[in-house]
Amino acid sequence: MITSSLLSRPGRTAPAGSAALRCRDRLAQRVADQVGPDGLVKAPCASRVLESSLLLRLLTVEGYAPHVRERLTRYLRNRLEHRPPDAIQGAVARAALGERLPGGCFAERALASFDHFTADRKRLMFTTLLAELGVTVFPRTRPEAFTARGQQSWLQAEMAALKIMTAYGTGTTGLLTERDWFLLAPAVRPGPVWEGNHFARLLALLALRKNPAHRGAVRRTLEAVTADLRPDGGLPFITGMDIFATAIAGLALTGPAACAHAGHRPVRCGTGPLPAAMADALATRQNPDGGFAFTPGVRQSDVDDTSYTVEFLRVAGPYRHRSAIAAAERYLLAVRNPDGGFPTFARGTPSEIAMTAAAVNALAPNPAHRTVVDEALAFLTRRRQPDGILERSWSRNVTNAVFRTTLACAAAGPGAPPGLSRAAGTTKRQATRYLASVQNLDGGWGHHPGDASDPISTAYAVIALSRDGGHPTALARALDHLVRAQRPDGGYRSRPDQAGPRPLLYDVPALADVCVLLGLAHAVGPTARPRV
């Protein structure tokens, strides 16, 4: 058991030889072993029912690759029987398998409780997909509903594909424009899947095949698509998250507490050959706009990956990577919204709590951004809820936004206006009090209060509690839970928390290890340099 009094202050480490330290060191070695020769953590995405179903549908209507259709069918039937997905993916899978389904209520029922600014678009998306699969009728909606100008690259392609499907399904093809077809062109270009996104490519192919001029290109592309199947016979949502996982792993290996901007005494910064190589690898993957994407080859930058990467580069080589850090800071400043918050992808889209907190954590160490940080903190304090729940978005657990906001609120240091410092302190205390109040009996947390505990959700909570210091008993119980959950190989298996399209979960198994290691590094300090 971890002695709770030893964890009562942020940055205080557990005694040497404790179970948590042994757990951390075994996990750190496992994470280090996952770093490839290119300096990146290998973080492939696992198969998912949605993409596998859409590919089966596409191959079926094209009469292509019967042996691949058999593999997809086995994968889907196995998932439906032994590991049923959510209602939306279940409906899509059964339709792709040729089963009769009653009406088109599945998407509406599953999305009814999804409280998010994208909910209307997601209802349109999945209703259209179910109509394409023959489950329901196509929605009668204006073409403007499919507009996604200024949004992330793959969303523009997805909405254009849905618009084309709807136009053909409702006999309104005269409403289509050259731009609609142009947005789908990357889906049939030779080479790796565009933007690493199988879902976007499949939607584009389903739409392109309706136009005889594009049928040949679609069939040629199918060979490349089927080559991307995983060994279990399914297709993933995206290729992987190597950049995202590497940035988090780098922070965990070097010691996030060492570079916290909250005024805590540094624990240790375990920089060495491996973290340096990881930082170099990330810096070379910077996009022309200064931002970073989730995996190599993706040109669409985002606040999430950019923020994590900036934090790591500051730890691993602030001078060596000063140019990359400065360019990334400029990217973040360019996407900031007038309300002081930060969106995920593009200025003008709604600001989000987790993304705003992430940007604060990336920018706060640079005094030149004090005003920007204060305005972002003001946004966060305005958005707090009385019960402490902040947001469930790209991460579907409540603990992700809580830990990131808790870290961000620590940025309201001596230089912040007094009112803002008080509000930030209240926000942090309220959020961690909420975490302690909904902790499961086994010491962990799930996606939502009452859900079974999982390592990723618990690790996020550990970060928040370790930086607050006000709930030592809850933190000790959480660390005990993570120690018990560690597998014989030193790693973790977890319910995934990443979502896309929101709110559908997708699994990148490597994230369980790197996220838990980050939590342990915050709670008990970074590990000694692992063997390389």
UniProtKB/Swiss-Prot annotation:
What the entry lists under SUPFAM superfamilies is as follows:
Terpenoid cyclases/Protein prenyltransferases
| Key words, A-Z | Isomerase, Magnesium, Metal-binding, Repeat
Q: Which CDD domains match?
A: ISOPREN_C2_like
Q: Which GO terms describe its molecular function?
A: isomerase activity; metal ion binding
Checking InterPro entries in the record gives:
Prenyltrans, Terpenoid_cyclase/PrenylTrfase
> Catalytic center at which residues?
D304
Annotated PFTB repeat ranges: 275-317, 325-367, 428-469, 475-518
Q: Where does (2E,6E)-farnesyl diphosphate bind?
A: R121, K122, Q152, W154, R502
Q: Where does Mg(2+) 2 bind?
A: E158
Catalytic activity as recorded in UniProt = (2E,6E)-farnesyl diphosphate = (5S,9S,10S)-drim-7-en-11-yl diphosphate
Residue sites binding Mg(2+) 1 per the record: E158
> Cofactor binding mode, per the note?
Requires a divalent metal cation for activity. Binds a binuclear Mg(2+) cluster coordinated with Glu-158 and the diphosphate moiety of FPP.
Could you say which cofactors this protein requires? Mg(2+); Ni(2+); Co(2+)
EC id = 5.4.99.-
The superkingdom of the source organism is Bacteria
Stated family:
Belongs to the terpene cyclase/mutase family.
Task performed by this protein = Catalyzes the cyclization of farnesyl diphosphate (FPP) to drimenyl diphosphate.
What is this protein called in UniProt?
Drimenyl diphosphate synthase
To which species is this protein native?
Streptantibioticus cattleyicolor (strain ATCC 35852 / DSM 46488 / JCM 4925 / NBRC 14057 / NRRL 8057)
